[in-house]
Amino acid sequence: PHIKICRTRQKTIAKLGGLCYNNKNILILDRGEGLMAKNKLVTPVVKWVGGKRQLLEEITQRLPKRVTTYCEPFLGGGAVLFSLQPKNAIVNDLNADLMLVYEVIRDNVELLIASLEKHENTSEYFYSIRDLDRDKDAYREMSAIDRASRIIYLNKTCYNGLFRVNSSGEFNSPFGYYKNPNIVNASVLRAVSKYLTANHVQLFHMDFEEVLRQVPRGAFVYLDPPYDPVSDTASFTGYNRGGFGREEQERLKHCCDGLTARGVRFLLSNSSTLFIQNLYAGYTVETVHAKRAVNSDASKRGAVEEVLIRNYGT
């Protein structure tokens, strides 16, 4: 169910902006110099609900100063991972299509770029590509490259970049009618591919609890689960079948208690609901504000109140 990537190269890396490594590949964060990635082209390749670009500064300010292994069980668009670019990482997402995209970027980026260049920005073509997953047998026969290309294309051309599937797991976001969507973005794809292949990054597709069992003592875990809804209509878990309700939130809290008992530091983001604040009452809970750009309702995009929860000091 998972794929392991190559070993990281052992070498000393000089300080680069707010990030540097020592000769043991321990990521050292100098929070006083702000956030600066080693390669600015290593950025998210897909737009994802709950993406953390708008919250990066708040997250980075609260990271522990030394990180030997970075773990992210709810990867999504990977904004935090790609900003930090750790040498040793364990990353995971329950969305199989999303993890396939990362595997193909790592293993076959040039063939992926060639496939993306063939796509058309028309409504008729969009729906023909979108509906490929209606025939389950035919969809399974598609190559990994074509399936990854399809997901990126749909993400770049669907309405507001909202990756959404129905109860049958079929992509159902409508066409976005964008004039010039950046479907290919080859420079970013190549940069992300280089990052994934040059470092010890492990890609997983499994339940978050299974991944967290593999995290070694002394590691750092960033948790960005589907958020607890602030109202009865606010929940969005359409990027995966099944959803993520209160029972899942409680199961995640139990995992966080287990991490703490094992000496693993974690930082968790979620919505600022009374349920979440009470659930994590024994931890450091801080309120922050983030701007949300992906929402099917345009009136609900904008600044929202969230919480960052951690089990370690500043």
Q: Model regions: which residues?
A:
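SAM-dependent nucleic-acid methyltransferase catalytic core
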Residues: 13-18, 22-54, 61, 65, ...
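Short, glycine/acidic-enriched loop or turn micro-motifs at the edges of active sites
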Residues: 75, 96, 210, 227, ...
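Short, low-complexity intrinsically disordered segments enriched in A/P/G/S/L with frequent Arg
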Residues: 6-9, 19
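Short, polar loop motifs at secondary-structure junctions
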Residues: 74-79, 189, 270-274
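SAM cofactor-binding core of SAM-dependent methyltransferases
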Residues: 68-133
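Short loop/helix-cap segments at secondary-structure boundaries that form the rim of catalytic
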Residues: 81-85, 213-215, 276-282
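Conserved acidic-Pro-Pro-aromatic motif
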Residues: 218-304, 308
